[in-house]
């Protein structure tokens, strides 16, 4: 589908969801395109397996609706050619070595995943091979083959992560550095962020700049104001708001993300940021500061129904809600409007070209009474 048609379709779908629940006039500003339509992803997680039962080793992505079959996917339009060259190099090496992949049923085997990350601004690349501990195998020869690749970027680190969990997910039980270092820095709107293989970070770096610039525009001035960034992840939005704010407090349930947020804030010299690890529902009662502005950037399923009234009870003048799932946003907007807020404007940001996903940013304002009426009551 033509990219402009994709944008029109996404904007239309989101607007319909919003129009169905928004009760007042509001401005829908359409959709902002991703700066890159192809090759925009900065992270890929590949899985070892086979394309069919007892077939040759494959390294790629799961077939649609399949837990077991793997498709080797070089030529994917969502990443640049460096990913394909790394994928093919590792696949060919492991095929020659005859190493077994980890079987989900028997829980036996060695090879599990290949994780590749690339910094868009610097070209730094991290490669992480994830295996079980069921075998010992030297990765020195593979490291030499990777170093010899003709890449547009440059390999900053080649890592080996061990994961003996039975779950089909990348878990870091122990990581060794085979080559280089275990991190790089990515640049975003003038700030730098330390990225490790397991960092939480938007997968479209240039699209993230569009998204966060939009959020910053919607928020307006933060001078001398206290900002709550709820569901803050690695604190990207909080840090972008911090330079002129009185204070920014981020709350995030994933402790590793909070640690990264604190490290990045320190690296960027932002002393007015505070990051708290915990569930928003439980933590918010213990925060002594009162916000002037609230930013909401929840997971796909939206905000816990018990947390939302607590958040809204602060009665701040403005809330900016960033959503990666418009149907969850629409559901939450019903409650938000019930508690005295109205939608001023909204727009979409296409972070995921060639897919059906899109981000939505909404600005909400607290409705204040127009005035008051004095009533004199006389009792006879």
Where are these regions (language model features)?
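Nucleotide donor/acceptor-binding cores
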Residues: 42, 123-125, 224-225
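Short, aliphatic-rich beta-strand segments
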Residues: 116, 123-132, 192-196
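Extended interfacial segments that mediate partner engagement and assembly in macromolecular machines
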Residues: 1-103, 121, 135-136
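Short, acidic/hydrophobic/Gly-rich beta-strand patch recurrent on exposed beta strands
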Residues: 58-63, 128-130, 261
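Short edge beta-strands and adjacent turn/loop segments
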Residues: 108-121
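Rossmann-like S-adenosyl-L-methionine
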Residues: 138-140, 144-380
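Solvent-exposed residues in well-ordered beta-strands and their adjoining turns
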Residues: 47-49, 64, 117, 130-132, ...
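Short helix/loop segment immediately N-terminal to the Walker
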Residues: 101-108, 227
């Amino acid at each position: 589908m033509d990219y402009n048609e994709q944008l029109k379709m996404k904007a239309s779908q989101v607007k319909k969801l919003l129009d169905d629940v928004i009760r007042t006039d509001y401005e829908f500003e359409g959709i902002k395109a991703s700066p890159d339509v192809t090759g925009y992803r900065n992270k890929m997680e590949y899985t070892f397996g086979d394309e069919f039962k007892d077939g040759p080793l494959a390294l790629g992505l799961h077939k649609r609706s399949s837990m077991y079959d793997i498709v080797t996917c070089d030529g994917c339009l969502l990443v640049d050619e460096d990913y394909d060259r790394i994928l093919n190099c590792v696949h060919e090496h492991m095929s020659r070595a005859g190493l077994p992949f980890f079987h989900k049923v028997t829980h036996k085997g060695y090879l599990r995943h290949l994780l590749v990350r690339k910094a868009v601004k610097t070209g730094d690349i991290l490669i992480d091979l994830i295996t079980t501990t069921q075998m010992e195998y030297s990765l020195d020869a593979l490291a030499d083959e990777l170093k010899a690749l003709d890449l547009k970027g440059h390999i900053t680190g080649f890592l080996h992560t061990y994961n003996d969990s039975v779950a089909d997910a990348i878990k870091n039980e122990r990581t060794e550095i085979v080559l280089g270092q275990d991190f790089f820095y990515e640049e975003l709107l003038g700030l730098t962020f330390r990225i490790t293989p397991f960092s939480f970070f938007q997968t479209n770096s240039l699209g993230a700049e569009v998204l966060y610039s939009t959020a910053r525009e919607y928020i307006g001035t933060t001078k001398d104001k206290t900002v709550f960034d709820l569901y803050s992840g690695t604190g990207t939005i909080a840090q972008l708001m911090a330079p002129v704010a009185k204070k920014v407090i981020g709350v995030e349930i994933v402790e590793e993300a909070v640690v990264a947020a604190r490290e990045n804030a320190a690296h960027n010299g932002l002393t007015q940021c505070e990051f708290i690890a915990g569930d928003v529902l439980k933590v918010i009662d213990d925060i002594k500061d009162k916000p002037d502005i609230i930013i909401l950037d929840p997971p796909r399923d939206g905000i816990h129904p018990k947390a939302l009234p607590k958040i809204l009870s602060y009665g701040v003048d403005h809330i900016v809600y960033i959503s990666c799932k418009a149907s969850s946003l629409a559901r939450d907007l019903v409650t938000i409007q019930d508690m005295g807020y109205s939608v001023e404007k909204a727009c979409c940001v296409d972070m995921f070209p060639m897919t059906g996903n899109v981000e939505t940013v909404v600005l909400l304002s607290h409705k204040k009474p127009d005035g008051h009426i004095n009533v004199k009551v006389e009792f006879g």
